[in-house]
Amino acid sequence: MHTMNKTAESVWDNCLSFIKDNIQEQAYKTWFEPIKSVELTDNALYIQVPSKFFYEWLEEHYVKLLKVALTKELGKNAKLLYKIKMENTYGNKLPFTEQLPSAHRSPVRTQEIDVPVQQKNPELRNPFIIPGIRNLKIESQLNANYSFDNFLEGDSNRLARSAGMAVANKPGGTSFNPLLIFGGVGLGKTHLAHAIGVEVKEKYPEKTVLYISAEIFTQQYIESVKKNNRNDFIHFYQLIDVLIIDDVQFLSGKTGTQDVFFHIFNYLHQNGKQVILTSDKAPVDMQDIEQRLLSRFKWGLSAEIHQPDYETRISILKNILYRDGVEMPEEIIEYVARNIKSNVRELEGAIISLIAQSSFNKKEVTLELAKQVVEKFVKNVKREVSIDYIQKVVSDYFQLDLEVLQSKTRKRHVVQARQLAMFFAKRYTKASLANIGSQIGDRDHATVLHACKTVDNLVTTDKQFKKFVDDINKKLSL
């Protein structure tokens, strides 16, 4: 068939019938039915898609399929060009079109995120300052006290700290982009995130660094939608060289904010800017965060900060005493370190409170005083039950050997015991599902999730099983 007789429509129809045979119907309906063919010139087919995100999705997931389909129709020099036609861009009532090359030809630099036509370059609004000031002075929001100097290294944070250092030395230039630091409360995620920012500012004063919590980011975004300046919001964030977002799990369930963050993230990543995220969960345990965002969180490095071990706890205490110029007997430091294990924040709180008590009451710090202070702290902290302890309690309750509980056996009573251990590990510890699985017989996170669901279901339908749960719960709550 000569190209002469071909129309954009006929070429695209043929492509579609090929594509339809090669993907699931639902995917076809979602991603291919909305596309319109626009024009055909030589060996280039223009297709119209409804949004920039739509284009990114096609390029990310279906570019090979599109290429094969088009090559069949137009030969090996086939080109696919996109026209993005947004019927209604945010705050801009006229539709507008922009053209983008497809990834499999040498792309001209694509335009930045959809700028409405009539808004060529008005004042850019910085969500942090009064609008109307032309020269954007962006306050980094960093806390200079949170530096690498006072972020002590130990086994519990070595990976995260070294990755943080590498990023601070070469922001955007390592494979740790994004760098996601995750772990329980009070272990130093925020401190490390600030430390990276502080270090970058020291080494590269010309770089724009911004620290912001996901909660404030969300509030700013909602505000920008209300005021009809979502684009300004996006452009502001595109100016940042090192963006640090704290507690990114706060975005869960907030689809609008996730969508805008997705665009900002893509832009920053493609332009070699650095993104640093902190979270109290590993990506695999985050609920209600879109898949496309989660997959991007995994592009770089996810580094977990664990609870500090005994040696690290001692160093942390000594460091605080040294900074405050206070001497304290070794046995007292050891006593505090042995008894406060859950997190760094409580450890610091206890020692600071101890120093305050002694200077305030003009008393020597004695072991007795240390016991009183530590008791106050430990009382207020729900005792962290370890996964090992949970497995031991469950095994004893069912009179099983620990090895049997962790084995691969599928005997019903063992499977139930194993599922209960997983269920209580999720309830009583801050460990990630993957971590729980690996400690209970080397299972994956999906197994743990399934176990928790099974236990939830059985508790409501099986009296005997509910008794198991209540009994073990009592033993663990002692």
Swiss-Prot record:
TM region positions: none
Similarity annotation: Belongs to the DnaA family.
The protein's role, per its UniProt record: Plays an essential role in the initiation and regulation of chromosomal replication. ATP-DnaA binds to the origin of replication (oriC) to initiate formation of the DNA replication initiation complex once per cell cycle. Binds the DnaA box (a 9 base pair repeat at the origin) and separates the double-stranded (ds)DNA. Forms a right-handed helical filament on oriC DNA; dsDNA binds to the exterior of the filament while single-stranded (ss)DNA is stabiized in the filament's interior.
Region of interest (Domain II), ranges: 82-140
NCBIfam families recorded: DnaA
Nucleotide-binding recorded as keyword: yes
Subcellular location field: Cytoplasm
Keyword terms of this UniProt record: ATP-binding, Cytoplasm, DNA replication, DNA-binding, Lipid-binding, Nucleotide-binding
Protein name: Chromosomal replication initiator protein DnaA
An annotated GO cellular component: cytoplasm
Description of its domains: Domain I is involved in oligomerization and binding regulators, domain II is flexibile and of varying length in different bacteria, domain III forms the AAA+ region, while domain IV binds dsDNA.
GO MF annotation list: ATP binding; ATP hydrolysis activity; DNA replication origin binding; lipid binding
CDD domains named in the record: AAA, Bac_DnaA_C
Gene3D superfamilies: 1.10.1750.10, 1.10.8.60, 3.30.300.180, P-loop containing nucleotide triphosphate hydrolases
Protein species of origin: Flavobacterium psychrophilum (strain ATCC 49511 / DSM 21280 / CIP 103535 / JIP02/86)
Binding site for ATP: 186, 188-190
Region (Domain I, interacts with DnaA modulators), start-end ranges: 1-82
Assembly description: Oligomerizes as a right-handed, spiral filament on DNA at oriC.
Domain III, AAA+ region: annotated span: 141-358
UniProt record, GO biological process: DNA replication initiation; regulation of DNA replication
Region (Domain IV, binds dsDNA) residue spans: 359-478
